[in-house]
């Protein structure tokens, strides 16, 4: 089962530097997705969304997409139109080749005042007598239905015959409701209305129903899992399988405590290989300043900074820069800035109070010593 994750969204948002908060368009077609999730919360400025050729059975989780103009859900398992009332700017909706059978559900789209293009080609509801007239009358804002322009005379005819059409459509909706209850009873009794079918060559045949599409997906996933297991077993049984597995295993990143326990100290690390400088005498010896040359156009959402009393960790696209410190600092006083000119990252951390006190005492001792030396020179000169 494919799922919509933050990682998937960022990979599909490479044209926007992986930033999701201001993403305008994203394509998630052919990802074996069964449920819409995360998009409505992570990408609230989305205007164009492609979810075609998946296994989505319900329209949900899109109520926060106030700027969404085009939604493509063609070739999925959707049986009912719902969940789009919050998409105030929606102009185009494509539900081609789904399983919407109850044409009355199009009335849920009345709230979408700007909707002027609707595609329902290939859905069972298009075979209902009076389908087009019913939709044209139910959605007066429509300019185009199933790729054909809605003309004024067609709208007038639909209005005149609305009573007869409504009777036929409601009767069909009632039949569909009874059929749905029957299907639920089959499922409750753990029976299948779609037993496996094979042709004369013994090849598996599938029908065009939501259940059989999902069954096809499950069988494909099981076949892929079985092939991976067989491949893994072959590699494991080969002479150099164990060695190859050890070499290909990604090293686990150690925590600071684990690194000290293993090496006796913290190591300097630069996994992203970015230039950086460390100034431990900044502000007249009162603070530490770490400057990292981060690429100018890299999104700030891909940068994370962690400061502890004796080290600084900077994660750039999940790659670690670790800088041990010779003196303890005060993490609560950290100040992080990013240059809008060249993207440079500047981290300033003041030293811990006891370190500042030691620095101050050392400075006073140095000044007294310099004062005594100056007095001795003056006495030698007068003598």
Swiss-Prot record:
Its main location: cytoplasm. Residues 201-244 are annotated as: Disordered. GO terms for biological process: axonemal dynein complex assembly; centriole replication; cilium organization; epithelial cilium movement involved in determination of left/right asymmetry; epithelial cilium movement involved in extracellular fluid movement; establishment of localization in cell; flagellated sperm motility; outer dynein arm assembly. Residues 128-146 form the LRRCT domain. Residues 211-239 form a coiled coil. One of its GO terms (cellular component) is cytosol. Keywords: Cell cycle, Cell projection, Cilium, Coiled coil, Cytoplasm, Cytoskeleton, Developmental protein, Flagellum, Leucine-rich repeat, Repeat. It is found in: Cytoplasm, Cytoskeleton; Cytoplasm, Cytoskeleton, Flagellum basal body. The keyword Cell cycle applies. Pfam families: CS_DNAAF11_C, LRR_9. The keyword Cell cycle applies. LRR repeats lie at residues 20-45, 46-66, 67-89, 90-110. Involved in the regulation of the cell cycle; is required for the basal body replication and new flagellum biogenesis. Belongs to the tilB family. This is Dynein axonemal assembly factor 11.
């Amino acid at each position: 089962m494919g799922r919509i994750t933050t990682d998937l969204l960022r990979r599909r948002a490479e044209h926007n530097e992986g930033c999701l908060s201001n993403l305008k368009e994203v394509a998630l077609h052919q990802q074996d997705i069964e449920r819409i999730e995360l998009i409505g919360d992570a990408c609230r400025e989305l205007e164009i969304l492609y979810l075609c050729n998946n296994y989505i059975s319900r329209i949900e989780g899109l109520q926060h997409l106030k700027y969404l103009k085009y939604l493509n859900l063609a070739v999925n398992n959707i049986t009912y139109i719902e969940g789009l009332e919050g998409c105030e700017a929606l102009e185009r909706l494509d539900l081609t080749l789904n399983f919407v059978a109850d044409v009355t559900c199009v009335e849920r789209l009345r709230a979408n005042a700007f909707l002027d293009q609707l595609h329902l080609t290939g859905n069972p509801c298009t075979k209902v007598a009076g389908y087009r007239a019913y939709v044209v009358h139910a959605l007066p804002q429509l300019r185009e239905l199933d790729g054909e322009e809605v003309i004024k005379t067609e709208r007038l005819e639909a209005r005149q015959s609305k009573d007869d059409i409504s009777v036929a459509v409601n009767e069909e909706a009632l039949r569909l409701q009874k059929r749905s209850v029957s299907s639920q009873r089959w499922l409750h009794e753990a029976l299948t209305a779609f037993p496996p079918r094979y042709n004369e060559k013994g090849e598996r045949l599938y029908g065009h129903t939501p259940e059989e599409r999902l069954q096809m997906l499950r069988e494909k996933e099981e076949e892929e899992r079985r092939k991976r297991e067989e491949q893994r077993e072959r590699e494991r049984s080969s002479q150099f399988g164990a060695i190859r597995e050890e070499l290909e295993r990604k090293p686990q990143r150690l925590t600071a405590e684990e690194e000290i326990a293993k090496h006796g100290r913290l190591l300097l690390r630069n996994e992203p290989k970015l230039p950086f400088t460390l100034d431990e005498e900044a502000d007249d010896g009162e603070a530490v300043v770490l400057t990292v040359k981060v690429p100018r156009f890299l999104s700030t959402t891909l940068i994370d900074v962690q400061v502890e009393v004796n080290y600084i960790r900077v994660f750039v696209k999940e790659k670690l820069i670790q800088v041990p410190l010779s003196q303890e600092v005060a993490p609560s006083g950290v100040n992080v800035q990013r240059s809008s000119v060249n993207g440079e990252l500047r981290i300033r951390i003041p030293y811990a109070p006891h370190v500042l006190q030691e620095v101050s005492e050392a400075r006073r001792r140095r000044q007294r010593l310099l004062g005594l030396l100056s007095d001795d020179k003056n006495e030698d000169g007068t003598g």
